[in-house]
Each structure stands twice: as structure tokens, then as C-alpha cells.
Amino acid sequence: MKSLQIICLLFVLVARGSCHSCEICHNFGKDCQSDETEECASAEDQCGTVLMEVSSAPISFRSIHRKCFSSSLCKLERFDINIGHDSYLRGRIHCCDEARCEAQQFPGLPLSFPNGYHCPGILGVFSVDSSEHEAICRGTETKCINLAGFRKERYPIDIAYNIKGCTSSCPELRLNRTHEEHGNGLIKVECTEASKITPSE
């Protein structure tokens, strides 16, 4: 469960942006509030709120993050990744011209069944080469997503992460390699057609 929490916090940091100050707060749950603001850096251009949900049956939790974001991440708006083993990583992104953007709430997970496709599944922290397992795609999930990146902090090594699984559509994310002291790098974005499950003989 610790890995799920770390992934949740890192995923919203892969794209950082120049225009004004935004409220900054992070909290577990559905809401957060703070008097603290941050001046957006040169690559950031909008204030935004990301509501994350990570579930690994039978446990799930949500977190909320308000800060400066790049316009490319704002355009993503939402993501739903089935990482296998009854686990999901979901996000809702809302950006605005105000210092505080309201969160877009989650609808309930739709009832869906295996659709005959599968993808590699990974939810890895501290490595971009984590061990894979099979993610059985469900409902409209016919694409395989592969995201890898790192978070640069004050540690001797970068905090790496790798996410793979089934998704319904391919997100439009740009690679973001950073050389800043405290930055975020999205070093791999791949989206391919899911494979058909071959019936056993």
C-alpha cells in the first residue's frame, strides 16, 4: 500500500508551468485548503487541481493536489488505468484562471467484464524496470499504456516510477526531461493496441 501512496503523489508531478500564483496544498481525501501559494515557474501556465484515486482491492484511497501545472497536463483532464490484480489508478484534472480550482469529482467505477484483451501491468516505485504481471482488460479498455519517469529531490538518487496497464484511450502527454535540482521528468509515454487473449489449448 505504501507504493500506491507514493505513486499517487508522484504522478501529478510529472509536468510542472508562468503567469501567476496558485494555491498549493496536498491532502488525503476529497478536499484541501491552504493560505499558501506558489509562483508558477516558467514552464507552468495554469493553476489546477488533481483528484487521484488508487485502489487495490479491497482497499482504496483518494488524494487531492492543488498547484501550478503545465497546459499539456491540463489538457489530459482525466485518466483511468487498470494495472491488473483488481487495481486501478484514476485521476481527474481541472485547471482554471483562478488561484483555486475546484476538483472534478469521480463517478463510480462502471460495472464491466473482461473483454478478451490483456496488457502488461506494473505499479512500480524507485525503478523504471519493475517486474510485470498480466492486466486483464475490461469493458472499453483496448489500449496498453506505459508511463515512466522520475522525481528529482534532495536524495542521492532520483525517485523513479513506472506505470503500465489497460486504458480506454491514449493520453496526449509530452516527454518532459528536466535537469532542474527539484524537477519532474516524464521519460516514457507509450500507448499501443492491447493483445487478444489466446485461448488455452
From Swiss-Prot:
Family: Belongs to the CNF-like-inhibitor family.
Lineage: Eukaryota, Metazoa, Chordata, Craniata, Vertebrata
Tissue: Expressed by the liver.
Glycan-carrying positions: N176
Taxonomic source organism: Notechis ater
Superkingdom of this protein's organism: Eukaryota
PANTHER family: COILED, ISOFORM A, LY6/PLAUR DOMAIN-CONTAINING PROTEIN 8
Temperature dependence: Optimum temperature is 4-90 degrees Celsius. Weak decrease in activity at 100 degrees Celsius.
Subcellular location: Secreted
UniProt name for this protein: Phospholipase A2 inhibitor NAI
Disulfide bonds listed in the record: C22-C47, C25-C32, C40-C68, C74-C95, C96-C101, C119-C144, C137-C166, C170-C191
Keyword entries, A-Z: Disulfide bond, Glycoprotein, Phospholipase A2 inhibitor, Secreted, Signal
UniProt PTM: N-glycosylated, probably by biantennary structure. Glycosylation does not change PLA2 inhibitory activity.
